Every structure is written in C-alpha cells, then in structure tokens.
Design a protein with these regions (language model features):
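Structural preference for beta-strand elements that scaffold enzyme active sites
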Residues: 137-141, 181-185, 223-227, 254-258, ...
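Extracytoplasmic/secreted envelope proteins and their assembly/folding machinery
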Residues: 123-130, 134, 167-174, 208-215, ...
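N-terminal carbohydrate-binding/catalytic regions of secreted carbohydrate-active enzymes
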Residues: 73-176, 180, 335-361
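Surface-exposed substrate-engagement region within the catalytic domains
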Residues: 81-108, 233-354
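Second-shell loop/turn segments in exported
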Residues: 115-120, 129, 154-163, 196-205, ...
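Active-site cleft segment of glycoside hydrolase catalytic domains centered on the general acid/base Glu
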Residues: 159-179, 188-224, 231, 236-238
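Secretory targeting and sorting signals
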Residues: 1-50
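N-terminal low-complexity, Pro/Thr-rich disordered segments
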Residues: 28-33, 39-99, 155, 362-366
Length: 366
C-alpha cells in the first residue's frame, strides 16, 4: 500500500519527552482546563479563530517571536517543554550570533508540542512531562504509538513485540500519568491501516482488541482524555469506511478521534471531514493536528507530498478555542522540525532537522 496513502512516519529515534481531564465538558475550554488543574495540583491559529486561511495567516499575541515561553503560552492550557530540540536549537543559534534564525525558530520552541514516550519504557518520559506541567498548571499532550505491527513495515515500523507486551506498555503509560490532566492521541495510523487493508488480515482482531483495551485502561486515569486516531481527509476519502472500524476499536468509549496527525491538510478540510465522520459516530468530538498545515499540502503528486515537503508552514497554534463545538482542540501532534524520513535530504524519521524547522518557521506569517 505504499502508493495509496499520504504516509506520515513518526518518532523512530526520539526517546521522547509528550492531558484534559475527562470530567470536563466535551467542548474543552482553557478556563475549564485551568479549573480542573487547580483541583489536581496534587500531582496553532489564533485562539477563537474558527477557520484560519490555508496560507497560515493566523496570528495571536503569542505569534510575536520575541515573546517568552510564559507569555507565548498564557492563552493556552498546554505545557511547553523548555528542553525541546527547538528550544536547544534557539539557544545554540543565539550563542552563534544567528539572532534572526533564533527569533524565527521561537515560533516552534514557544509552542506546546506532543510528547511521544519511549517504546521500551514510557514512564520516565511521561513522569518528566507531568512534573513540568504541574509546575505551571498545564496540560500535556501525549501520543501512544507502539501498537504491534506498526506502520506496515515502513519508515516507522516496529511496535510492541506482541499483544501482552503492548498491554504492559499501555498499563505503564497510564500509570505514569496518574491523576494529572492529559490528552492521549492513541495510535496514529492504526485504524486507517485496518480500513485500507495495509495491515494483514491475521492481525485485525488483535489490533481491534488492543485498541479497545488501551482506551479502557487509559480512561481509568481520572484526568485523561483519549482520542483514537482516524487518519486524514486525503487518506480514507469516504469517512463511512472508517466509522465501523473506529467503533470496533472502541471510539465510543473514548473522548473522540484525532485527525491530520503528521499531515498537512488544512483546518477547513479536516473540519469538514471530521464533521462527516462525527455524524456517523453519534456526534463524536475530535482534535486536529495543525502543526504543519499553515500552507496546506504540497500541490501535485500526493504520493510525494507526505515526506518533508518544501514550502510548508506552521499552522494554528495549540488551543482549545477552536470556534467549533465538535473540535475539542487544535494540537501540534507532529513535532515541527522532526523529519518524516530520509527523503529530500532529510535525516531518518523522527530526527531533529534544524533547516527544515527553520523553513517552517520562516514560511509562517505573523
């Protein structure tokens, strides 16, 4: 199936770093998150803009690249990692006198991006993020990406060695979150790969079972919201073909589904597609990855458009103020500046690529 879907590899090499309490109303607001976080202290688009232009012309007060991390995230409930690759790159360029480049890259370093915990032991990465978020009363976004037979053997192939290893991993993942407020994006690609036939039929039953069990386990954490991945509008073009696979995987017991992870589809395209899919799933809510969709997808051959496409831009900054009652959040799930794979001169999937990160930042208006 290598020629059919706009593939999007994820973290191959990051050991990682990457919540909204399920007691919140389904439409997430920053105020609601903040209130919930206060209770739990024991432990990108301008906010309010419902339809940013495909050109990435969104802006808010945090778009000023000279702002500090604290200022840049004041209107967002999400945690910004002060030790991210982007933050370290900014520091290095400042020392080297590359002031303009450092200023541009703050468009990434001062935004909240998802954490992809390690595949061998997720607990240290999660614990570090939860501690950091608690200090600032913030929510962390995590990605659980370790399903057996992941990615059909392509750039991000791998995953847990077997079903029990995955159950153990998810149990450790959930336990490390504890009572902290968290969003978990569950297994990018896993359900679409069932729907498009890329995952061999002999693995289907096990995958449906594991995804459903993962949702159940994660939802035992009182502050965790779970969104089961549903691909992007340019993959399974007919949302009706995804509805039953998502139901079999347990989406009705999750908080909704996620769209556009690591892809470049515009907000409008994702919202239109998500609204159709939501209608087939009892008005399920969803999130949209806006990390790199400021210019939309690369025109031309879609089979070539998924991997480090040139001329792209950062999208709507992470926010819960989406202007759409079905869209719970715009999130940066793909970490901008990390390679999609060894194409167009890029390093291996998941490796930090400063030049590409700078290109995304410079193309972003505002």
């Amino acid at each position: 199936m290598s020629g059919r879907k706009p593939h999007h590899p994820h973290h191959l090499y990051r050991a990682s770093r990457t919540p909204l309490p399920r007691s919140l109303p389904r439409s997430l607001t920053a105020a609601a998150v903040a209130a919930t976080v206060l209770v739990l202290t024991a432990t990108g688009c301008s906010p309010g803009s419902s339809s940013p232009s495909p050109s990435g012309s969104h802006r808010d007060s945090a778009e000023r690249t000279g702002d500090s991390v604290a200022e840049a995230t004041a209107a967002s409930p999400f945690w910004v990692d002060p030790a991210s690759d982007a933050a370290r790159q900014v520091e290095q360029w400042e020392k080297e006198g590359r002031k303009d480049d450092a200023k541009a890259l703050r468009r990434i370093s001062e935004r909240a991006v998802a954490e992809w915990p390690a595949w061998d032991n997720p607990a240290p990465d999660i614990s570090r993020a939860v501690r950091g978020a608690a200090a600032g009363k913030r929510t962390v976004v995590f990605v659980a990406y370790n399903i057996p037979h992941r990615d059909c053997g392509r750039y991000s192939a791998g995953g847990a060695s077997d079903a029990q290893a995955y159950r153990d991993w998810i149990n450790d993942f959930a336990g490390a979150i504890g009572k902290a407020p968290a969003i978990v994006i569950l297994e990018p690609d896993a359900v679409p790969h069932l729907a498009d036939g890329c995952t061999p039929a002999e693995h289907h039953h096990e995958r449906y079972e594991l995804l459903s069990q993962a949702i159940t386990r994660l939802k035992q954490q009182p502050g965790t919201r779970v969104y089961l991945d549903a691909g992007n509008p340019d993959w399974i073009s007919d949302p009706a073909k995804l509805a039953e696979p998502l139901r079999r995987a347990g989406v009705n017991t999750a908080d909704g589904f996620s769209l556009n992870v690591s892809n470049f589809q515009t907000n409008n395209a994702a919202k239109a597609y998500g609204t159709q899919l939501s209608g087939l799933l009892g008005d399920a809510h969803f999130t949209i990855d806006t990390s790199r969709n400021g210019q939309g997808p690369l025109p031309g051959d879609r089979d070539e458009a998924w991997c480090n496409p040139p001329g792209r831009a950062l999208g709507t900054p992470p926010t819960t103020k989406t202007g759409n009652e079905l869209v719970d959040a715009f999130l940066w799930i793909k970490r901008p500046g990390e390679s999609d794979g060894p194409c167009r001169g890029g390093p291996a999937a998941g490796r930090w690529w400063p030049d590409y990160a700078l290109g995304l930042a410079r193309k972003t208006k505002g």
